[in-house]
Amino acid sequence: MPLQTVLTQRLGLSHPIIQAPMAGGATTVDLVAAVCEAGALGFIGAAYLTPPQIADVSRALRARTARPFGINLFAPLPAPETPRDAAPALERVAPYHAELGLPPPTLPASTGDPFREQLAAALESGASVFSFTFGILPAGAIEAIKARGMFLIGTATTVEEARALEAAGVDAVVAQGSEAGAHRGTFAADFEAAMIGTMALVPQVADAVPVPVIASGGIMDGRGIAAALALGASAAQMGTAFLTCDEAGIPDAHKAAILGAREHETRLTRAFSGRPARGIVNRFMREVEGPGAPGAILPYPLQNVLTRPLRTAAAKQGRAEFLSLWAGQGVRMARRQSAADLVARLATEAEAVVRRVAASA
């Protein structure tokens, strides 16, 4: 019997499974549509998309599925100050540009935050769910999202952040444990202090806020989903598990790295974007953050813009040592399969665990 929770009932899902909204190309229309059609909640990771791209992707997705889907943006952040001396950052990346046949790197310009325009496009996307990370949305944005009848989800890495999100008006909170791959959602605490594991974080957040909680971080199979529900979550959000699906839009070199990695081979890094994110350790991470490279990382999002040409070229050339190999600590459990097969397997496994535990009680 399918597992049902307050969240599955509210969102019209068959399973308490959410495909994480991974920005940067992973969440293709094929992936999101397959996840939704399988009865889970698929997400468009739209943080790096332009408004026209958001419109195009949403239109294509609506043509593929009539089931609920979500869209995700980064909360607007203050514009970073360009360092007076950015030479160390440019000098650190320059040899890699030469190695991949790229022109010398240039200092990225401080660009305006695209959130306002992205939000306008997201409101017209047809998504049933809107989620965000990196902070709290402006009150006007929350009002606009609610006016469209969209279910609103924020991301927390501490109880205090969860309480702040609930007070701002979110309908549910993602409790992102330290095991999670990619960027940390921390916004109201020191990054290191907010490195709380999923098993410890989820029940504390569930006790602290009255809205549904979504567990995230290191969950890769039905055992993790069942555990999340037992801890008080209403669903499990999974990213790394979906990155190795056939439909995921990451480079083959990234998929191969995930499938060959072990749990001790990921760590937090600022090397690629300037903001702490968990990925599989590679040459770029080791060398850019090495002891001989002080001051070689620009603040987010400048570092992200600086390294983008390198990452793009590396993807085309199959050079995993220069890719941001985002992955969580559950990486050893990753499998290569279709998104539909993954959702079906996760649901079957979770239901079996719940039955087994109930039978032994």
Language-model-detected regions and their locations in the chain:
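Conserved active-site-proximal phosphate/metal-binding subdomains
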Residues: A94, H183-A188, E192-I214, I219-A361
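Active-site entrance/lid segments in N-terminal catalytic domains of soluble metabolic enzymes
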Residues: M1-A208, L346
